[in-house]
Swiss-Prot record:
Gene: atg4a
Family assignment from sequence similarity: Belongs to the peptidase C54 family.
Sequence motif: LIR, positions: 392-395
Catalytic activity, EC: 3.4.22.-
Main location: cytoplasm
Free-text comment about domains: The LIR motif (LC3-interacting region) is required for the interaction with the ATG8 family proteins. Required for proteolytic activation and delipidation of ATG8 proteins.
Keywords: Autophagy, Cytoplasm, Hydrolase, Lipid metabolism, Protease, Protein transport, Thiol protease, Transport, Ubl conjugation pathway
Annotated organism of origin: Xenopus laevis
Catalytic activity, as annotated: [protein]-C-terminal L-amino acid-glycyl-phosphatidylethanolamide + H2O = [protein]-C-terminal L-amino acid-glycine + a 1,2-diacyl-sn-glycero-3-phosphoethanolamine
Function: Cysteine protease that plays a key role in autophagy by mediating both proteolytic activation and delipidation of ATG8 family proteins. The protease activity is required for proteolytic activation of ATG8 family proteins: cleaves the C-terminal amino acid of ATG8 proteins to reveal a C-terminal glycine. Exposure of the glycine at the C-terminus is essential for ATG8 proteins conjugation to phosphatidylethanolamine (PE) and insertion to membranes, which is necessary for autophagy.
GO terms of biological process kind: aggrephagy; autophagosome assembly; autophagy; lipid metabolic process; mitophagy; piecemeal microautophagy of the nucleus; protein delipidation; protein processing
Phylogenetic classification of the source organism: Eukaryota, Metazoa, Chordata, Craniata, Vertebrata
SUPFAM superfamilies listed in its UniProt record: Cysteine proteinases
Single GO MF descriptor: protein-phosphatidylethanolamide deconjugating activity
The protein, known as: Cysteine protease ATG4A
Amino acid sequence: MDSDPVSDYLKYENEPEYLDLEELPDSDEPVYILGKQYDTKTDKCDLQSDIVSRLWFTYRKKFSPIGGTGPSSDTGWGCMLRCGQMMLAQALVCQHLGRDWRWEKHKNHPEEYQQILQCFLDRKDCCYSIHQMAQMGVGEGKSIGEWFGPNTVAQVLKKLALFDEWNSLAVYVSMDNTVVVEDIKTMCKYQPQSCSMAQAASHQSTWSRCRDTSGHCSGWRPLLLVVPLRLGINHINPVYVDAFKACFKMPQSLGALGGKPNHAYYFIGFSGDEIIYLDPHTTQTFVDTEEAGTVQDQTYHCQKGPNSMKVLNLDPSVALGFFCKDENDFNNWCEVIEKEILKHQSLRMFELTPKHPPHWPPFIPPTKPEVTTTGAELIESTDKLFDVEEEFEILSV
């Protein structure tokens, strides 16, 4: 199809065209996208639909200044924050819409889809906005406008999720390359209630059985599991490659955060030795809700062929993401990880242990401190938030 490059660019800024996957040629190698397998010779339309349906968060400009006097664009520094938003958004899509949900332009979508989008708008009163993430990053030692690594973004999402009552996600970020099954089940089976910092300091947090909106005990909060890893010193150790790629085959896969130094991507799959990613390095204008309360969603879906890079060119600092909707889903994840991914490694990518290591400090599930606002509104200072648990966390990889 003949096209004018200038007009194509203008269309992309305002209303992207649905493009062919010319960048992904026919191959005997299957393509895996977040737990789904495709044949490029026969499944290109389905593959295209799957990739386009992922929520795509990029640099934005002309939003209200962060903190009132800070930057009004995240161009140049917010790429890892945007990748973290994409991973979390995929978890929320799986939770509310299901992995098989597909986006179509100009089609009415479920109300939950709009609710998910509104969690990530570039406004200070949206739970996972660039404003909230940047300001929560201050508590992780990152100045507003400073580049984040994958582990720092994971820690920020874990803390912001405590203010997100609609999704009620349990966010677990592994430490010391170890995933502790017992700790995850403790966190997912109980829902924290707001407590004072004095109570948290004395480990007297108030907990109650997780309940759904009807008041019945649901028994399990949906789990966002993030595993920060360093898969080498300066480059990825080839011994980890097969296990890393195998994680994208799992039905619980949320992909991975990573990329190159100061240049983050959201990895969603692979084909052969090529790893496929969504790229946040496009600056688009801030989008707000319309009068009807809906969000114009065209610019939140990447309607062009996917990007890819050689897996060995990936920076070794990454964070794998997984979503487990219920306890059976998590048990299945544990079984596959142990028997099919970690067991066959000469050097294990990370450890999965059933019990809390006795030499570790006691596991204290995170609770939301008392704040003067509701939800995630106006988290202006994080100096005193969560300082109790910080001593137990590894905050850099």
